[in-house]
Design a protein with these regions (language model features):
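Bacterial Sec-dependent N-terminal signal peptides
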Residues: 1-25
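Secondary-structure boundary elements
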Residues: 25-125, 131-140
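Hydrophobic/aromatic-rich core segments of domains that either
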Residues: 130-212
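Alpha-helical and coiled-coil interaction segments, frequently adjacent to or embedded
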Residues: 192-442
Length: 442
């Protein structure tokens, strides 16, 4: 009967979250005092502020208002009650109506970037986006500047150095005596891997706190960082690559350097709210191909996620972390990337076990075993924390080995691996058995 249950459970787990992992990693510094990159000259932009009405107005601009920069500016600021709403209306109109000119971009040019030309053609690159923002904002009576510098945009990979002319442009607006950063180019959408423009509004790039903006924007003039302690270009290049969802989900860094040297394995910590789930993956720097299954492992330990990685050979890798809200359907989104320079590797390594989504959702944690392949006939100590579980069992074929409860949420016991895969299952109160972890036969 239990073998039938196992088969059903395995089928139900096809949609579960998968991650891969390792054991004796090199731990990063484990203190929250190290999380801030610098003390930002911050402001109250992150306070809850509803832009629903001003956004609706901007998104419904009639063609008659879009005939010139001055007429468009006049229309956009009609219902604005303050300078913040003026800036928002301009930002929202641009992000909805201007396409990124991928054809010109991939030819290495800029095309027309004058605000009037951009208004007519409805397409440009970052210099055109920032110019039309500048023109509309000034027409609206806002003190505005255009900033040139380096951006970690399309084609960027962790560890890349910037040289030559600036590759990006954005804006800053002065509101109530404070400067606010915004990037209407990146707020409008992105260029996909197949070199096509995808319109997708990203609110992160409107009034972004300087302490977040610096991770992917480096101005030529350090004063436009708006930081108490400006970072150098080299420091900027060394910062970990963070996606907007890293900030949107409330994540915090345990290691801010984007390039890390390691031996055969590494361990990195990410602090995350309780309602956030995470997973990880490993790719080769050259070509972006996945390194294979079993080389990464990600699990929560109270307020942080521990991400482990092993390397099949010496070389350079991109370690990626993905995250999502616990109660939201859909895929995990990329939140950060590290470049790992591994001095050595082990292709014969047993790797890490496969974690199913139920373990992550329950806030479980595997203490042992952490190797992904178990030798048939060998005995292993299984030690796992599973909040809310009434029973936890190790299953090999038709043999079930119940783990003993060792206090609050902790289960442990010895079990012998047999031929085939080994699974760990939990029975939660009032529910059936759920798969938590799977090990392969060595």
């Amino acid at each position: 009967m239990r073998s039938i249950v196992i088969l059903i459970l395995l089928m139900l787990q096809l949609c579960a979250v998968m991650a891969t992992a390792e054991t004796s990693g090199v731990p990063e510094k484990d203190t929250k005092n190290d999380l801030a990159i610098i003390a930002p000259n911050d402001f109250n932009a992150t306070l809850n502020y509803s832009y629903e009405e001003i956004d609706r107005h901007a998104l419904n601009a009639p063609a008659s208002a879009e005939s010139s920069v001055d007429s468009l500016a006049a229309y956009l600021i009609e219902p604005a009650g303050n300078d913040r709403e003026k800036a928002r209306a301009i930002f929202r109109w641009i992000t909805e109506n201007i396409d990124y000119n991928v054809e010109v971009f991939f030819k290495g040019g800029t095309g027309p970037t004058n605000s009037e030309d951009v208004l007519k053609s409805r397409k440009s690159v970052c210099y055109g986006y920032s110019d039309i923002f500048l023109s509309l904002a000034r027409e609206a009576g806002l003190e505005t500047i255009r900033i040139s510098g380096y951006g970690k945009g399309y084609g960027y990979a962790p560890g890349k150095n910037f040289s030559g002319l600036p590759n990006h442009a954005w804006n800053a607006v002065k509101i109530n005596g404070s400067w606010y950063l915004m990037d209407s180019t990146w707020g409008a959408g992105y260029v996909s891997v197949d070199k096509k423009y995808v319109r997708k509004f990203d609110d992160h790039f409107f009034m972004t706190p300087p302490s977040q903006f610096i991770y992917d924007h480096f101005p030529e003039d350090a004063q436009w960082q708006f930081l108490d302690e400006p970072v150098s270009k080299q420091e900027f290049e060394n910062l970990v690559y963070l996606e907007p969802d890293f900030f949107n989900l409330g994540l915090k860094l345990g290691q801010r350097n984007g390039t890390i040297s390691a031996d055969k394995q590494i361990n990195i910590s990410i602090y995350a709210p309780e309602d956030v789930l995470m997973m990880a993956g490993l790719e080769y720097v050259d070509g972006g191909a996945a390194a294979g299954d079993g080389y990464t492992f990600c699990q929560r330990d109270e307020e942080r996620y521990d991400i482990y990685a092993q390397f099949p050979a010496a070389g350079s890798y991109i370690l990626k972390a993905y995250a999502k809200q616990k109660d939201e359907p859909g895929e995990y989104n990329s939140v950060l990337e590290y470049r790992i320079n591994a001095a050595s590797g082990d292709k014969e390594s047993p790797g890490f076990p496969m974690i199913y989504g139920k373990l992550s959702e329950a806030g479980g944690y595997i203490f042992s075993p952490l190797e992904g392949k178990l030798k048939a006939g060998s005995s292993y100590l299984f030690r796992i924390r599973v909040p809310g579980a009434g029973n936890v069992s190790v299953v090999c074929g038709e043999e079930w080995t119940d783990l003993a409860s060792r206090g609050v949420d902790l289960f442990e016991g010895n079990a012998t691996a047999g031929k085939g895969d080994v699974g760990v299952y939990a029975k939660f109160h009032g529910a059936g058995w759920d798969g938590l972890v799977r090990y392969n036969e060595e």
